[in-house]
Regions:
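Short, electropositive, low-hydrophobicity segments enriched in small/polar residues
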Residues: 16-18, 22, 54, 82, ...
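Serine-esterase "nucleophile elbow" of acetyl-processing enzymes
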Residues: 1-47, 61-69
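Generic detector of short, locally flexible boundary/turn motifs and exposed helical patches
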Residues: 9-14, 38-41, 56, 75-79, ...
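Structural motif
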Residues: 51-60
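Alpha-helical cap/lid subdomain in secreted, periplasmic
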Residues: 3, 34, 59-231
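Cell-envelope and extracellular/periplasmic
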Residues: 15, 46-51, 77-82
Length: 231
């Protein structure tokens, strides 16, 4: 890696922006930031909550000078696109290709991520297959590495909305990303899970289970109301 490189650059939405509640005392940080820490590289994150692929192109790309050069460019987008009623696979794929092209102009390596199949409440269902096919096609055209998150979704790794990763979920994504990058020749200096420390007790587990059950019920009722309103 050249000394003039600027480290890791990340485009995306709230998942890549990070931030949120502690989990067993562990801060919720972006998976991309954990990747940068694992690679011992500087991090530049321009992801914005609620972003869609169009927002990446219009708002995020212009924030990074065209002459800048990074070791790794990360793109995780599509969750907000695919959950909209006006979802358009062809338009998304064009936008995703353009976003990867913008990263390629600035980065030595590219990494993009697919979307978990069990996405959202109500579920996005078949549309998730479409967004993942678009991401795969875009990545192949750009020569980007792909982190497959289709099966991602363990209870302690995803919030009850089945969209946003927990603090442990962000770390789990980063660990998988580092596996992909290591296989491609990048030097992983430290594993994110070794950088955290937490302690659980019977009472804290019970409180956590109760909170999870309450939030899951709220989410289920909200999803049911959405379905009823759509009828």
């Amino acid at each position: 890696m050249s000394a003039c490189r600027l480290g890791v650059l990340a485009f995306g939405d709230s998942i890549t922006n990070g931030g949120g509640e502690l989990q067993w005392g562990v801060a919720l940080q972006s998976w991309a930031q954990w990747v940068a820490r694992g690679l011992a590289l500087p991090y530049t994150g321009v992801a914005v909550d609620g972003a869609r692929v169009e927002d990446v192109l219009v708002e995020q790309v212009p924030r990074v000078p065209a002459g800048a050069r990074y070791d790794l460019g990360c793109l995780y987008i599509g969750v907000n696109d695919v959950r909209r009623l006006d979802w358009d696979r062809a338009a998304f794929e064009r936008g995703h290709r353009a976003a990867l092209a913008a990263l390629a102009e600035r980065c030595d390596r590219l990494l993009t991520l697919t979307v978990p199949l069990d996405l959202g409440r109500p579920r996005a269902e078949g549309k998730v297959q479409e967004v993942n096919a678009a991401i795969a096609a875009s990545a192949a055209a750009a020569g980007a590495l792909v982190l497959d998150l289709r099966g991602f979704g363990a209870r302690n790794q995803v919030m009850t909305d089945h969209v946003h990763p927990t603090a442990f979920g962000q770390i789990a994504i980063a660990e998988r990303a580092l596996d992909v990058l290591a296989a491609d020749g990048m030097d992983v200096r430290v594993r994110p899970h070794t950088l955290i420390s937490y302690e659980t007790t019977r009472w804290r587990r019970l409180r956590g289970d109760t909170t999870y059950a309450y939030r899951r019920l709220k989410q289920a009722l909200k999803a049911a109301n959405v379905h009823m309103g759509a009828v």
